[in-house]
Curated annotation (Swiss-Prot):
Taxon lineage: Bacteria, Bacillati, Bacillota, Bacilli, Lactobacillales
Class in the EC hierarchy, top level: transferase
Name of this protein: Purine nucleoside phosphorylase DeoD-type
Catalysed reaction equations from the record: a purine D-ribonucleoside + phosphate = a purine nucleobase + alpha-D-ribose 1-phosphate; a purine 2'-deoxy-D-ribonucleoside + phosphate = a purine nucleobase + 2-deoxy-alpha-D-ribose 1-phosphate
Known EC number: 2.4.2.1
Family the entry assigns: Belongs to the PNP/UDP phosphorylase family.
Keywords, in A-Z order: Glycosyltransferase, Transferase
């Protein structure tokens, strides 16, 4: 979300400068506790994040990438506003299978970032879940019941970008992690949040992401 990047820059970074406005995909560089940090929107879905993440890695030499965004719960024990750290990302997309047609290439987080983020979140007292997520090509899937079934297999949530991010990180040997806030629930329909809340109030994941990037 480009407006989420703007929110992070305005509320967490010092001396933030906008370095990109092309396609309204705002990007900012500033400092957080003395460390230079960049934040940028990546659009919606795996094709979009694949473009921006690859350019950040290949053209700008970025070595650590953390996605902060929203996800829908697939598990009755994972509730709105709680955090999910994606240890791994299953996917129904063919993006990866186009490269590896005879393999199920596992999309996993950087353990270094995952371990740091988990302990930082717990030290903050945030309710945090670690496990598998589903990266889907469709927000409004025709396979709703199938996705719900994944929750019974321990999949925490569904989102649209983590698998592609982890795949690019593996390809280019850099570190990546996806930190999501649960914005709604597929198993508890009464749990929901507004668009404004999603843009401006999901600050826990932002704090964890920033602290993880500067942790020793």
């Amino acid at each position: 979300d480009p407006l989420r990047a703007k929110f992070i820059a305005e509320n967490f970074l010092e001396d933030a400068v906008c370095f990109n406005e092309v396609r309204n995909m705002f990007g900012y560089t500033g400092t957080y506790k003395g460390e230079r940090i960049s934040v940028m929107g990546t659009g919606m879905g795996m094709p979009s994040i694949s473009i921006y993440a690859r350019e950040l890695i290949v053209d700008y030499g970025v070595k650590k990438l953390i996605r902060v965004g929203t996800a829908g719960s697939l598990n009755e024990n994972v509730h709105v506003r709680e955090l999910v750290l994606a240890q791994a990302a299953a996917t129904n997309s063919n993006i990866i299978r186009n490269d590896w047609p005879q393999y199920d290439f596992p999309q996993i987080a950087s353990f270094n970032l995952l371990d740091k983020a988990y302990h930082i979140a717990k030290n903050f007292g945030m309710t945090t879940h670690v496990g598998n997520v589903l990266s889907s090509d469709e927000k409004y899937s025709n396979y709703f019941e199938k996705n719900i079934e994944l929750g019974k297999w321990g999949v925490k949530a569904v989102e649209m970008e983590a698998a592609a991010l982890y795949y690019l990180a593996a390809q280019h040997q850099v570190d990546a992690l996806a930190i999501m806030t649960i914005s709604d629930s597929l198993v508890n329909p009464d749990e929901d949040t507004t668009a404004e809340e999603r843009q401006n109030t999901f600050t826990d994941m932002m704090k964890v992401g920033l602290e993880t990037l500067i942790a020793d």
